[in-house]
Every structure is written in C-alpha cells, then in structure tokens.
UniProtKB/Swiss-Prot annotation:
Belongs to the OMP decarboxylase family. Type 1 subfamily. Pathway: Pyrimidine metabolism; UMP biosynthesis via de novo pathway; UMP from orotate: step 2/2. This is Orotidine 5'-phosphate decarboxylase. One of its GO terms (molecular function) is orotidine-5'-phosphate decarboxylase activity. It is an enzyme of class 4 (lyase). PANTHER family: OROTIDINE 5'-PHOSPHATE DECARBOXYLASE (PTHR32119:SF2). InterPro entries: Aldolase_TIM, OMPdecase, OMPdecase_AS, OMPdecase_bac, OMPdeCOase_dom, RibuloseP-bd_barrel. GO terms for cellular component: cytosol. It catalyses: orotidine 5'-phosphate + H(+) = UMP + CO2.
Amino acid sequence: MLDPKVIVALDYPNQDAALAFVDRIEPGSCRLKVGKEMFTLYGPDFVRKLHECGHSVFLDLKFHDIPNTCSRAVAAAAELGVWMVNVHASGGERMMAASRDILEPYGKDRPLLIAVTVLTSMEASDLAGIGIACAPQEQVLNLATLTKNSGLDGVVCSAQESTMLKSALGKEFQLITPGIRPVGSAAGDQRRVMTPVEAVSAGSDYLVIGRPITQATDPSAVLAEINQSLA
C-alpha cells in the first residue's frame, strides 16, 4: 500500500517481543507507533531498528514544554527520520508554531507534525476535574482549530469528532484516530471507540490500532483483513 491507513501501536513489555512482531508483518501494510514506554526503555536505537526493517514510524511522545524546548525535541525527531511526531495542542500557539517553523529546513523530508487534542480516555467529568467546563467535543474543536491556525498538519482525535473536524477544518487537515477496535474486539481502556470502517467513513485519515493486531495469533492476517475492509 502506498499510504497505509493503519498505524500499529507497539505496546510491548520488551524490545525483543516488539521486533518479533515486526518481523511478522509487511512494512507496506501499516506504519508503527512508538510511545513513551518503549522509547524511554530503548531510545532512538529502537526507532532506527524499525527503520532498518523498512517501517515508517509515528513517534508518539506528545511533547509539551516551552516553545524552544518543544521545538528542539521536534527537530530531534526529524533528525531521527520519523514519519510523524506529535505535540500537545494545549501547549498553545507559540509552542506549536515554533515546532512547525523548526521543521522548514527539512522540506519534503520533514515529518508530519500533529497535535493531541483531548485524550480518548477522557470524558466530560475528567475535563471538569482539570478546570475545563466544556464537553470533550467542544474542547477538541477548540484545540484542533488552534492547531490548524498554528500551521500544523493535523490532530489526534477520536473518530466521533472526525466528521465535525473535517467539516470545520477542511479535507487536507489530517485526522489520526486511536480508540479503533475491529468488530468483536474489547474496548479496553479507550472510552470513545469505533471500528476501522466506521472511523474512515467518519473522516479519519489514519487509524491507531494496538492489541487487536499485536495480540492476535496471526497479526498479518488481521492486518490484511482490516486493510481489505478499507479498500
């Protein structure tokens, strides 16, 4: 696939298990997401190993800091050669704009830069607990609009917000959606979930899927089935 929609979340207890999984799937069938746990344990060398296997990597570290510090972290991700990197939209416009600007020298080789809006585990009561009075959907739109105005490529959002965001922010604004569960999968700790077909129909551009693929007896077959459903 030239532009696979599935991003597999590599949430493994150790590097060997992750690399064993990677050996079982075709690089062109998906992209891989490396999050905080695995990056903290195994660092940039782990990402380099994934690149050596032919895979594109979404570095999901959700940078959130003062503009100078955040932008330098984003530049470090670009130097590592990742396909996508993210920041927290709640860091504000100056932080996001600085992160965007620092990628300009990379031209067409720069990673996609996206922002996290409202974590998919959060409900209205969770937002209220941190002093945000609006509903999750309203806060997602607020932060996604700020992200677009800051010049970023897109946002992480739940599939339930995808149609709203595509309508409000345009088709070119990329939507990356976690909380995706193929039919028959458990919801786990995600609160706002959809199937792959539902999510793409709603407007999501890329789908983050973890355990339904990584814990499958035949992950390549599960991935192929998902890709076929989206063809």
